[in-house]
Amino acid sequence: MSKTVGASRFRPAGWLQRAGYAPQVFVFRNLESGQVIYSQLPTFTERQINKNFYRPNWENRKPSTRPDIWKCMAVVDLASHEESVRLYQNLCRLRYLREVPQRKAAEQLRKRNEFGHIWYSAQYRPTYTQEAVADLRECLLRARGGATVHWEDPWRMGDRAKHWAALPAVQHQFLPRMANVAREESAILKQLGERAKRAFAAPAPPAPAPQSL
């Protein structure tokens, strides 16, 4: 099975583990529009875009899958494959809430320009990446076993002291800067996956023996 076909479907924890994937969730951002897509694998397909953009409109059109306009914004390492599936599902649920049942409330919180539209520069609307970071933080509040977020850059995570101090079990690292984005990003994501698999497979340190009184 190709990675493209594999990425187009929802994958349960057992499948991810049998297929040799690490317990991770990937967050990609569109360089032109600021839109965000979540994936269980280090790639995504048009089918995922169709499922993640529930009610597209002129301010939030379905984006293209062209690889040159997408960049990995964050990779999240979780303690287990079950936790990675739970995080992915929760992120998708929050996206659905913003776009469908709570759309009016979400629209009221988005920064507007003088014409009442979502603020943008050219085609880029930063509100989508900001909402994705807020949703990621909210979901990680409930993550079991801690997590490590590999960010595109320090700026992308927001104010660390203000937004992340309440999550001491979440560690933060930063992806190396890339020149040839498509090729180098693929290699870096592969390295992160291999490292996360080794960490997941490593035995937990033994608990200290109880001391007699």
Swiss-Prot record:
It is found in: Nucleus; Mitochondrion. InterPro entries: Ribosomal_mL67. GO terms for molecular function: DNA strand exchange activity; single-stranded DNA binding; structural constituent of ribosome. Keywords: Mitochondrion, Nucleus, Ribonucleoprotein, Ribosomal protein, Transcription, Transcription regulation. It comes from the Eukaryota. This is Large ribosomal subunit protein mL67. Its main location: nucleus. It holds the Pfam family Mhr1. The lineage of its organism: Eukaryota, Fungi, Dikarya, Ascomycota, Saccharomycotina. It comes from Eremothecium gossypii (strain ATCC 10895 / CBS 109.51 / FGSC 9923 / NRRL Y-1056).
